[in-house]
Amino acid sequence: MDKTYQPHAIETSWYQTWESENYFAPQGVGDSYTIMIPPPNVTGSLHMGHGFNNAIMDALIRFRRMQGRNTLWQPGTDHAGIATQMLVERRLEAQGVSRHELGREKFLDKIWEWKAESGGNISRQIRRLGSSVDWSRERFTMDDGLSEAVKEAFVRLHEDGLIYRGKRLVNWDTKLHTAISDLEVENHDEKGHLWNLRYPLADGAKTAEGLDYLIVATTRPETMLGDAAVAVNPEDERYKALIGKFVELPLVGRRIPIIADDYCDPEFGTGCVKITPAHDFNDYEVGKRHNLPLLNIFDKNANVLPAAQVFNLDGTLNESVDGSLPAAYAGLDRFEARKQIVAAFDAAGLLVSVDDHALKVPKGDRSGTIIEPWLTDQWYVSTKPLAEPAIAAVEDGRIAFVPKQYENMYFSWMRDIQDWCISRQLWWGHRIPAWYDESGKVYVGRDEAEVRAKNNLGPEVALQQDNDVLDTWFSSGLWTFSTLGWPEKTKALKTFHSTDVLVTGFDIIFFWVARMIMLTMHLVKNEDGTPQVPFKTVYVHGLVRDGQGQKMSKSKGNVLDPLDIVDGIDLETLVEKRTSGLMQPQLAKKIEKQTRQEFADGIASYGTDALRFTFCSLASTGRDIKFDMGRVEGYRNFCNKIWNAARYVLDKGEDCGQNGEAVELSLADRWIISQLQRTEAEVTRQLDQFRFDLAAQALYEFIWNQYCDWYLELSKPVLWDETAPVERQRGTRRTLVRVLEVALRLAHPFMPFITEEIWQRLAPLAGAQGKTIMLQPWPVANEARIDQAAEDDIEWLKGLMLAVRNIRGEMNIGPGKPLQLFLKNVSAEDQRRLSENDYLLKKLAKLESMTVLTEGAEAPLSATALVGDMEVLVPMAGLIDKGAELARLDKEIQRLQGEVQRVGGKLSNAAFVDKAPPEVIAKERAKLTEAEQALGKLAEQHARIASL
């Protein structure tokens, strides 16, 4: 084996071997265990969230595969409608071409070209992370089989009365010219205004105060062109007498009614609210309650129309309401119209005041443009009938959320679910399987031929397919079963569905998880007709944030690419990567400065195993995952530790009883075997409960602290002792080999590469059969091998050795200097342990002699420590220069006193505490505590040496 562990050298070659040997495919025996990869965007690249997700899924799949389950981890990518279309449009714009100039077919060809060019990027990255997915089953949400499944799902839902077309208010993205869902809208806190406008009362009506007008407050004066009413609270005494009367709409001249509705807050503004049902979601609900007309005043760009389109609530045209609008505003953009309308109100003496007002401004998460509530024809899924069984499946335990608290988030959304708008005005995606004849009548079918046959339409009837495509989340919602061949009753569908676990971030519980449950339960049935669930467990993890707890985003400049941690990246390339392609180029300088400070030497190459182990160790039940590069470095050291231990074991491991020769187990052998049983049980228990952090912790503790730090040291005196029986030496060699081999199997789901590399060399010595560690059996604890007596004895031994080690450290005595040891207050049990382990203790603690003091006997002046009730004494004569040691301690104490004074002064300075960021203050406080503790220890040491 190489002297040092070089991850690069082994990772790519092992992955190729595993893939070419087909180890990732289901083995065809045992109960099935299935995970579907949440499909990343085909044209994107993996971020830290994906890296985390993959580490967790692969740990589960490798664990279950070793347990003998018939595992399928199926990969695939998502066509990601809006994101991909925007990306390709931007590329074309850079060449001076728009999609409209190209036309639909040619534009789609361009997207497929781009997919072919960049689609392999994701697959390459997934491979680099060591993910053991079955590549032979890779799927894409727009491939032929999935397109058929999407059409089938749409048609069946339509036939069941669960998909309908209707004119409703939607979130309209005026830049992308498509409807988007509530979940794709981000609300931004901004400072805005509240305009107070006068609306004259009609027919000579007066308020209780004798005024002939009402004052309405609005944050969107431009929408007054589409007002259908003014609402007041039914209990508001000021306006009770006016309910049912009319106002004259300024600038337009339309008479609109005064209505009573609980939506109005009498305390807000004047208590009068303008109601624009076609341009505000709350007003739309008021309009439904009062059967108000819907006046749409904007086109798809949110420019004012020459005349309002007036509709009834059922989407039919309303011809009884006059939709005339002032010609002056026709064609104006909504914000320009706002300026001119406010100016017109002011000129007419109808602008009362303009107040500052905090707003929540809705913006599209992709385009960043302000969303316009807009009346348009769209396709909808009726979700309430689908939500009921989906809620029941979680309530009765057919689906479990881990951690359980996420069930509440799921329930609260599902119980208040709105119908789902599934049509998008895009070109890239699954085109809606609906056709229109010339009169506008709509027909739904799997293809045009089926539509014609089903509805007896001859060739003389011209049909035009709907131009819209389906929301990406519709096809993603079918992911667990469409990828297994549904609607055909395939063997794969029967074997691997329902799947076992979905691993996902909490941010897409609504987007994806809920919709998968609803669609799967409606469309996929068991043989007895009962609904299948898509998965039995939803493991929900938090968002991966940076070390300061900030969300990782391009604009913050704190994004890390998991492969840069695996392979390393130099500083200049990292700066270039973080500052190019910014939406806000003005941030580049700040991001560059921050990157140069944080990664002055770039990022070292840590290898996949260290990164994966970091992800697993961070997978707690919390909402957020704070990613810390220090942890990756720590786990890279852990890899080195395992590598060095393996080199020692391979060097010492020959003649370890491979052929059944007699062995004798030492106390240390029995102890480490006992500890191994406990670790096997603990790692298995924690993986069963999805506590990857606790499983990783148990493994780390066993390998680093017990096996490497203690057992390897305890093995040396046995192997060095020329007088030791050959059976005992063979027993220790066998234990070294076999315990490491089992530990490698336990670590394999977390660290696949290093464990495979070492296992290949160790397997012959351990008597292990098979070509790969991947398909070795998962270790199962044997309670009969738990040896409490050996554990107690070794704990005592460790206590004594640590006591001697601490005295050396405190008194500044070199580790190689032989010591005399006196022991006082020694019990019979202590005496037994001393005599049985005399050779071991003298060798490892570097002791010249050990003397048990009889009662009343005194040791020379000594440094002391306690092991239980037993006193450990090391005489100091000739070991230290008392004067020099006190002078050294005085100097160190003086330095620390200065540090305490400096940091304490800083923290008691109000100006510093008020202005410094919380993380800086926390750092300073930690510094102060550390210095104070060190000072206390040095003072004790000083007193002890002074008393010698």
Swiss-Prot record:
Q: Where in the cell is it found?
A: Cytoplasm
Q: Which GO terms describe its biological process?
A: valyl-tRNA aminoacylation
Task: Kindly list the GO CC terms recorded for this protein.
Answer: cytosol
User: What terms describe the molecular function in GO for this protein?
Assistant: aminoacyl-tRNA deacylase activity; ATP binding; valine-tRNA ligase activity
Among CDD domains, the record links this protein to: Anticodon_Ia_Val (cd07962), ValRS_core (cd00817)
Q: Name one Pfam family in it.
A: Anticodon_1
Q: Which residues form a coiled coil?
A: 879-945
Q: Just give the chief location class.
A: cytoplasm
Which amino acid positions bind ATP, per UniProt?
554
- What keyword terms does UniProt attach to this protein? Aminoacyl-tRNA synthetase, ATP-binding, Coiled coil, Cytoplasm, Ligase, Nucleotide-binding, Protein biosynthesis
This entry's Enzyme Commission designation comes to: 6.1.1.9
Motif range ('HIGH' region): 40-50
Checking InterPro entries in the record gives:
aa-tRNA-synth_I_CS, aa-tRNA-synth_Ia, Anticodon_Ia_Val, M/V/L/I-tRNA-synth_anticd-bd, Rossmann-like_a/b/a_fold, tRNA-bd_arm, tRNAsynth_Ia_anticodon-bd, Val-tRNA_synth_C_sf
Q: What reaction is this protein's catalytic activity?
A: tRNA(Val) + L-valine + ATP = L-valyl-tRNA(Val) + AMP + diphosphate
Motif window: 'KMSKS' region: 551-555
State the function annotated in the UniProt record: Catalyzes the attachment of valine to tRNA(Val). As ValRS can inadvertently accommodate and process structurally similar amino acids such as threonine, to avoid such errors, it has a 'posttransfer' editing activity that hydrolyzes mischarged Thr-tRNA(Val) in a tRNA-dependent manner.
Tell me the domain comment: ValRS has two distinct active sites: one for aminoacylation and one for editing. The misactivated threonine is translocated from the active site to the editing site.
The record's subunit annotation is: Monomer.
- Family membership, please give it: Belongs to the class-I aminoacyl-tRNA synthetase family. ValS type 1 subfamily.
Name of this protein: Valine--tRNA ligase
- Lineage, opening ranks: Bacteria, Pseudomonadati, Pseudomonadota, Gammaproteobacteria, Pseudomonadales
